């Protein structure tokens, strides 16, 4: 009977439904002689079968079982128990093998080397064969292998073959790493622990070792951040038998390659290594990023590779990594000249200034043209934040560089709205610069109007003064709420002196700015009085002035009083005033936390306000939540209770308003109460006048990540039977999204 037929016969035997005995008991009754010897002989027979010969699934499973039983009876029973896992120890049968471990090793090892039908089943037990190999190797080193036969690894003719399947330098890294990790049991002897760790280190230092380790380690939880951190910690731990420099010289190039395929894992690795060996990481990254300093781009590939890595690095929240990114700014500014790379370069620069501010762009400025290219990419808001530092650098430049930067300063000024400029920062910068220019040698210590003999320097300084004074004039023109606190108090003396300056344009401008600042002293009272004016534009200006005072958290602001004033202004009949009031209320809630709580209480006070006024308060709450984003979660309980209360209101528009607020909250955090309320609306509110209420309920459900089965059932019904096409289509989209989310979760 050939080996294939034996497999089929044993498969039938083992699948007998009326025989519930253990597998080994069944086999003992049908095999004459020693079980282990029979299995080993059968495996040798199978190894001689034609590899193209098809095996049924049943035969293959039977073969896998025989290989497993061979290890169970021949290997597990003879190895020390501390080397085995608890599962293997529990599975041990009462059996004494007639072949020792060396004999079994010498049979199984050639089978693994020979291309045959056994390759797959044996590789499933590769870790066990590796364990047997290491055990026998240790026995040999301890001098306890003195009897025949000798293990094959001692046979010179087999040495190279054994190395090819047992050496960590030859075997596929992921296969070896997986085996070593599975063998690292808590109670294994120190010699085995050291040997396995050495094998792991050897694998990690190979060209694809890190990738192999991550493939194995992350397999259980591929999307887990915590698992990724654990993997990074293990890889960044330097083994005892190798220096950090040598170890990371093998690891870091692999991490660099990972940035293109697994950026999230590469980031965790870089963070872990930086925390323990910052100098090594810094040196490595700077050397790799040095390509960006090349004067010309000949081959795009290395530049794109470096930029791809840098694009990931700029999002790592680590000060040392950020400093490395910052050091690349001059090179990045220069690389903007390459049209292919420009977009990616500018994205990186934008991220750097969002983290480090704009000074990093100016600290090593060598070419104003490069900076101008970047500034053209900035939004007005970004340009406004950039302007103060640009002015500082401009004034501090040597005379031959100022003219080059002046064009950029003028470009920035002409493209920034005056109310976009950060007022206090800008005024502080301009004040310091005016005092600096005014104190230069062209003036005496007492007379700022004294003319220097060096006319060229004076003209240049006059140009600077004009720019700075115009900026200040523009800022205070849109910020009537500025008081005489710093930096204004330190600006007034310089303005007084400049009022007597010989250049008429400068003196007139200085007088005008000085007068405006003095008159702005009592702007808070002025703003409140404006809100009571009969003229719509004046009321609007009063609200605008209050909003600006709120946004800078002026000490004179009483949040309770101001909220009361603003809510009363919602009764104003003019929509222009409404819009300004809502913006001011949003700013108040953003700056003073308790204001949102008070606003929620006012929202529920429907006896005090008309429906339209209640809806405007709801709009203010909605916009406040939009501005605060995830920070609004701290008011989750109050917002949820308020919305649930308002859903009981008889007015449909008020219900829709509360559903819109609830929808925004559900985008940030889940609420079973909101989901249930929306479901009930779809079931109960069926009239034609409830169409928009039902739409709002569907939109709320669309904002929820996970919906219970009862809601899915409701959506399925509504999606098929509702008369409103918008509602039907929305329901079907929600169902599709929920199905996709469930599919992703299962994967």
UniProtKB/Swiss-Prot annotation:
Primary localization: cytoplasm
Compartments reported by the entry: Cytoplasm; Nucleus
Keyword Nucleotide-binding carried by entry: no
A Gene Ontology biological process term: protein secretion
Keywords: Cytoplasm, Nucleus, Repeat
InterPro entries for the chain: ARM-like, ARM-type_fold, Rtp1_C1, TANGO6/Rtp1
This protein's GO CC annotations: cytosol; nucleus
Keyword Nucleus found: yes
Subunit record text: Interacts with RNA polymerase II subunits. Interacts with nuclear pore complex subunits.
Protein family membership: Belongs to the Tango6 family.
Function: Required for the cytoplasmic assembly and the nuclear import of RNA polymerase II.
Protein name in UniProt: RNA polymerase II assembly factor rtp1
């Amino acid at each position: 009977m050939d080996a294939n037929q034996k497999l089929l016969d044993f498969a039938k035997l083992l699948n007998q439904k009326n025989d519930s005995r253990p597998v080994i008991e069944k086999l003992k009754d049908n095999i004459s002689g020693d079980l282990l010897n029979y299995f080993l002989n059968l495996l040798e027979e199978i190894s001689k079968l034609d590899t193209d010969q098809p095996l049924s699934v049943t035969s293959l499973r039977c073969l896998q079982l025989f290989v497993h039983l061979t290890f169970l009876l021949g290997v597990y029973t003879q190895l020390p128990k501390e080397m085995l896992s608890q599962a293997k120890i529990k599975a041990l049968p009462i059996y004494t093998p007639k072949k020792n471990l060396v004999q079994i090793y010498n049979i199984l090892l050639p089978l693994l080397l020979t291309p045959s039908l056994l390759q797959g089943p044996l590789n499933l037990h590769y870790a066990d064969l590796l364990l047997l190999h290491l055990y026998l190797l240790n026995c040999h080193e301890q001098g306890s292998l003195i009897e025949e036969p000798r293990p094959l690894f001692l046979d010179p003719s087999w040495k190279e073959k054994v190395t090819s399947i047992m050496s960590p330098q030859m075997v596929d890294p992921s296969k070896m790493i997986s085996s070593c990790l599975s063998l690292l049991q808590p109670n294994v002897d120190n010699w085995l622990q050291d040997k396995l760790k050495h094998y792991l280190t050897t694998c990690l230092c190979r060209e694809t070792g890190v990738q192999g380790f991550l493939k194995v380690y992350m397999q259980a939880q591929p999307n887990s951040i915590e698992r990724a951190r654990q993997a990074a910690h293990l890889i960044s731990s330097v083994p005892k038998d190798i220096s950090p420099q040598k170890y990371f010289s093998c690891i870091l190039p692999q991490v660099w390659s990972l940035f293109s395929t697994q950026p999230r894992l590469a980031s965790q690795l870089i963070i872990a290594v930086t925390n323990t060996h910052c100098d090594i990481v810094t040196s490595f990254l700077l050397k790799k990023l040095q390509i960006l300093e090349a004067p010309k781009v000949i081959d795009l590939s290395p530049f794109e590779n470096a930029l791809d890595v840098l694009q990931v690095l700029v999002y790592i929240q680590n000060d040392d990594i950020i400093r490395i990114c910052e050091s690349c700014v001059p090179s990045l500014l220069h690389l903007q000249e390459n049209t292919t790379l420009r977009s990616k370069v500018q994205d990186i620069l934008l991220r750097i200034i969002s983290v480090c501010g704009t000074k990093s762009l100016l600290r090593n400025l060598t070419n104003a043209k490069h900076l101008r290219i970047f500034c053209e990419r900035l939004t007005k808001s970004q340009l406004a934040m950039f302007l103060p530092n640009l002015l500082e650098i401009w004034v501090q430049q040597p005379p031959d560089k100022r003219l080059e930067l002046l064009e950029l300063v003028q470009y920035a000024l002409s493209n920034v709205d005056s109310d976009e400029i950060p007022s206090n920062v800008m005024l502080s910068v301009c004040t310091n610069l005016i005092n600096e220019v005014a104190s230069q040698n062209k003036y005496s210590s007492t007379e700022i109007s004294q003319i220097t003999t060096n006319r060229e320097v004076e003209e240049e300084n006059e140009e600077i003064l004009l720019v700075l004074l115009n900026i200040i004039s523009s800022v205070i023109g849109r910020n009537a709420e500025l008081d005489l606190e710093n930096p204004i108090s330190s600006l007034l003396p310089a303005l007084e002196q400049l009022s007597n300056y010989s250049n008429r344009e400068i003196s007139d401008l200085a007088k005008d700015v000085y007068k405006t600042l003095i008159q702005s002293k009592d702007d808070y009272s002025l703003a409140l009085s404006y809100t009571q004016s009969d003229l719509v534009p004046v009321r609007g200006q009063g609200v605008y002035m209050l909003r600006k005072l709120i946004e800078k958290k002026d000490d004179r602001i009483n949040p309770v009083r101001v909220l009361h004033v603003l809510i009363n202004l919602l009764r104003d009949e003019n929509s222009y005033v409404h819009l300004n009031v809502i913006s001011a209320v949003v700013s108040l809630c953003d700056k003073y936390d308790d204001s949102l709580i008070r606003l929620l209480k006012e929202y529920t006070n429907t006896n005090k306000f008309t429906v339209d006024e209640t809806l405007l308060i709801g709009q203010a709450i909605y916009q406040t939540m939009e501005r605060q984003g995830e920070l609004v979660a701290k008011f989750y309980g109050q917002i949820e209770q308020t919305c649930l209360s308002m859903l009981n209101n008889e007015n449909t528009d008020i219900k829709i308003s509360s559903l819109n607020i609830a929808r925004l909250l559900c985008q940030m955090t889940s609420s079973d109460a909101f989901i249930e309320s929306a479901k009930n609306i779809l079931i109960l509110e069926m009239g034609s006048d409830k169409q928009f209420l039902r739409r709002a309920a569907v939109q709320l459900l669309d904002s929820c990540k996970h919906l219970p089965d009862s809601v899915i059932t409701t959506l399925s019904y509504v999606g098929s039977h509702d008369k409103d096409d918008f509602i039907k289509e929305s329901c079907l989209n929600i169902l599709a999204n929920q199905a996709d989310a469930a599919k992703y979760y299962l994967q």
